Amino acid sequence: SLVLSLFPEGRLIILGDGTVTYRRNEALLRDAVATLDAKRELLIFPELKLDQLPLLAADLRDGDVVFLASSVLEVDGRLADFWRAGALVSAAVPVPVFVFWDFFMGTGVAGGYLASGVEQGAAAGELALRILAGEPPEEISVVTASPNRWVFDMAPLREAGVDVDDLPDGSVVINASPSIWRDFRGEILLVAIVLVTMVSLLVLLMA
């Protein structure tokens, strides 16, 4: 629902590797869109190969968003590792890329409501400690919900016109501060040139 509200007009493009994990995530996305915005256009590439990225990127337009629902495939059909998939997809497409797992963060993806192996491990550890402390396992409720959290990289979101204030409260945000050099490079260079010119003139006048 967050992505649909941030990008109300664009198409949703789902990329995957054809695995069982991908199929499950694709089904979740389909169900969510059918419930929240049934008229939203979906483009699905269930077994995308890396050499197809240029054609995909050329067809995208402002307002579209990509969901990397698992990994993608190498040219020879092998699974691309997650880091490589995240980096290459986010570099190739001119729109934000949302994901399901926190190990994609840092590759250029925009983020999302992410599952974390660390958080899941911590939850499992808490259950183990309760059992070791003597609590009967049959009295411990089964944990069915993954301890997910909102995690975002503002660099790609800022390029798409999303402000940090548009994100859910409590979100983990990286690259929250804009780069002064990137955003004001022209102004900084102009000021530097003026200062150098003034100093040079002063030196000449004092000589």
Give short role names for the model-derived ranges.
Residues 175-207:
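Alpha-helical transmembrane signal-anchor helices
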Residues 23-31, 37-140:
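Membrane-proximal low-complexity regions enriched in glycine and acidic/polar residues
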Residues 143, 147-180:
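Juxtamembrane amphipathic/hinge helix adjacent to a transmembrane helix
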Residues 1-33, 142-152:
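An alpha-beta-alpha
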Residues 50-57, 154-161, 186-190:
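Short alpha-helical interface patches
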